[in-house]
Amino acid sequence: MRVLGIETSCDETGIAIYDDEKGLLANQLYSQVKLHADYGGVVPELASRDHVRKTVPLIQAALKESGLTAKDIDAVAYTAGPGLVGALLVGATVGRSLAFAWDVPAIPVHHMEGHLLAPMLEDNPPEFPFVALLVSGGHTQLISVTGIGQYELLGESIDDAAGEAFDKTAKLLGLDYPGGPLLSKMAAQGTAGRFVFPRPMTDRPGLDFSFSGLKTFAANTIRDNGTDDQTRADIARAFEDAVVDTLMIKCKRALDQTGFKRLVMAGGVSANRTLRAKLAEMMKKRRGEVFYARPEFCTDNGAMIAYAGMVRFKAGATADLGVSVRPRWPLAELPAA
């Protein structure tokens, strides 16, 4: 079967077609980074309007890339939440409309389940059970995963997500939006140990995170030490090391608590090379395995939605023709497949 996936939850328009026998047949992506750069962050109204302009042309491009026509599509999956309500409504409206016109099922997909399942698109997909670290601009969560829809939240950020903290700290360092990848690049030139940032909430039991204090610590460090290039790089290094160490410490605890031997890392921040290297080293010492998607599937994309839609469709999930989205949607509320 072939599923068309539509992703419009924030500032990327992603369209993909997934075949359960042949794999990914098409993958189209348009990023709105340049549109929002002057504002230092995503402007919801601008994001929604740009999705309106880009979604249908990208669907046409995906069909052309795959060599398919509408008659070859067996289902349409779309991100129904969580995300920006206006952006979600664009994808949901287009998805439901196409499903009606093509007389195929419409499948609402949870955005974070899409991220969680993105490593399944790789040649060496993880087997259940595993601990999942979902780490992005909007979420930082540790989840026990024993099957599709069998998700137990172990811990999450009580304030800023890790990706949000990266972007905010990057802005303090004078970097453009989105600053997370630029901060990591700057950190590679930094001197380890010149500055030492705290590892929030690692001195107490539990698996929750807190990253807002690191931004404040960075602001104070910048104020007290100036902004020459090397100092900025050293601060970036200290910040990144603190975030990576914190995530690693919490992952260790989650693995100890569950007894699982596999760790899956997903979401935009999972593309961070330092984080990947540290977690790979940690899992090697534990004689376990770590899995993640290729970098282009770490950030928002249509491929993960098409794949998650296929999984949910096979489990019997479909929707009526009403258009509804859930800007806030806990992952634990999803039914088991």
Swiss-Prot record:
Its EC number is 2.3.1.234. Can be proteolytically processed in vitro by TsaB. The keyword Iron-sulfur does not apply. This is tRNA N6-adenosine threonylcarbamoyltransferase. Keywords: Acyltransferase, Cytoplasm, Iron, Metal-binding, Transferase, tRNA processing. Binds 1 Fe(2+) ion per subunit. TsaBCDE are necessary and sufficient for tRNA(NNU) t(6)A37 threonylcarbamoyladenosine modification in vitro in E.coli.
